[in-house]
Structure formats: C-alpha cells, structure tokens
Amino acid sequence: VRALTEENGIVLIFDEVMCGFRVAYGGAQSIFGVTPDLTTMGKIVGGGFPLGAFGGKKEIMANILPAGKVFQAGTLSGNPVATAAGIATLTQLKENPPYEYLESLTDKLELGLIAAAEKHQIACQTNRVGSMLTLFFTGGPVVDWSSARRCDTHRFAEYFWGLMDQGID
C-alpha cells in the first residue's frame, strides 16, 4: 500500500484510534513496518479522557496554522485535564511497556476459545494483531468483507449476549 500511494501521489493515512498504543507503543504502523503520511489517534492519547490527535510528515503538517493556511480546531482540542492524563499514560506505557504481558494473556484466551469451540464442534476462526483478538464463527479464514459476511452472525450474537449475561463485558 505504501509503494502504491507513493507511486500515485496519494496521502497514506492510518487511523490508529483502535491500535495506537494498544498493540505496540508505535501502533500498528510499527508492527507492520509502514510509515503513513498522517496518523490519527483517539482517547488513548488522552489517557482515556476525550481527546483526539493527528500528526504526520513535516511537509503536510506545515500546512496547519499557525505556519500554514489550514485551520484546525475542535471540542476535544487541548483540554488540560485530558492532556495531562495523556502525558501520564504515554509515559507509563513507554517506561513500563505492558505489550508482552498482554500478548501472553491473549495467547491463553485464544487457545481457550479455540479449544472450547473444538470441544463443542463449533467452527470458528480467530484474527489477531498483538493483544487485539476477534472471534468469527466460520469454517474458513476471514480476510476481507466478503469472508466476514459469510460468518454465522446469529451464533456470534448468542456468544456476545451470553458473555454479557455472565457479566463479561
């Protein structure tokens, strides 16, 4: 994707709202070894408080005021409490990275889910990046929208609501 966007003069944007600081300190881009032109982040950058951020290559960011002509503002811009919480969270993640431990727990969860499904003869697949894990009720790999659409969504709903009923949310 990176090569394709560069060849065609297209800005590559990564939405790290889900993966940023969750799968690795450098987000999904550090795992996959792809540097986008712009990155967006969500509330993790605010330590769980409402805050959003974006950043990118110097030549793009130079277009943002005060240096450039593009005005950017928002409800979640620069809240001091969220910013302080974000700095504390990011400092903690950098100084005491939890990623290896989280992945080891996810390994156990994934193996347990697969074993339980096999025991009850339920077809399922797991997709995973770092500690982010998704369970699909299907017999084949889920690699795109078409394969995801073929999953047993009714079984997933039963699974989901069963977890909720047990207080697992």
Give a label for each model feature.
Residues 1-169:
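Conserved N-terminal phosphate-binding loop of PLP-dependent enzymes in the Aspartate aminotransferase
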